[in-house]
Amino acid sequence: NDLRLFYGSCFALITTAFSFAIYAGILPQLGEDFDLSATQLGFITSMWLLGFPISMILGGLFYHAIGPKRIMQFAFFSHTIGIILAIYSGGYAGLIVATLLIGIGNGCTEAACNPMIADSYTGKRMNTLMNRFHMWFPGGIVLGSLSSLFFTNLSLGWEVQMWYIIIPTVIYAYLFYGQEFPKPRISGDAAIVKN
C-alpha cells in the first residue's frame, strides 16, 4: 500500500512536470491558433504560476484537517477539468481558467504528496524516497519537453500534447484509488502554530 501511494505520488509529480514543459512547448501554437499576443500568452502562463502556490499554501494549512486523500482527489479533479477545458476552450478566457485549474492541481500535488511520504516512512528510507520523489519534477520536465518537441516535429496539434498530460493523471488516480492514506504523525494544531 505504501509503495503504491509512493508511485502514485511520483506520477502526480510527473503530471505537474508535464504540464509545465508541454505548456511551454505549445505556447507558439496557441498564439497562432487563437491570435494571442505575447502579453496574453504571458498572462496565460502566469495562471499556472498563480494556482500553484495558492493551492500549495492552502493545501499545506489544511493537510491535517482534510488529509492527503481529499487533497489529491481535488488535484485529480483540477488536472482533469483543466486539461479538458484547455483542449475545448476555444479562446483566451477558457485558456486562462484551464491553466489556473492545472496550476491548482499541481499545487495540491505538492501539498499532499510531500507530507504523505514523510508520514509513511521514517529515517533513511524516508530520505531516500523523498529524493526519488523529487527527482521526477526535473525528470518529468525533460520527458515532457522531449515529448513536446517530438509531437511538434510530427506536426501534431497542441491538443494532442494536452491529451498526453492526461496519461500520468489517470495513472496516479488509478494508483491512489481505494488505498488507505497515512494519518499525519503530528497534530494539525502543532503544524499550524509552527507554520
Residue map of PLM features:
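Flexible cytoplasmic inter-helical loops of multi-pass small-molecule transporters
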Residues: 177-195
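Residue-level signature of mid-helix packing/kink "hotspots" within the transmembrane helices
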Residues: 21, 48-57, 142
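MFS 12-TM fold signature
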Residues: 52, 78-83, 102, 168-172
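Extracytoplasmic
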Residues: 4-38, 114
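Cytoplasmic helix-loop-helix junction between adjacent transmembrane helices
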Residues: 98-135
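Small-residue-rich segments within alpha-helical transmembrane domains of MFS-like 12-TM solute carriers
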Residues: 17, 21, 103-111, 142
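Conserved MFS/SLC helix-loop-helix module at the cytosolic interface between two early adjacent transmembrane helices
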Residues: 54-93
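Helix-loop-helix hairpin linking two adjacent transmembrane segments in secondary transporters
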Residues: 124, 129-181
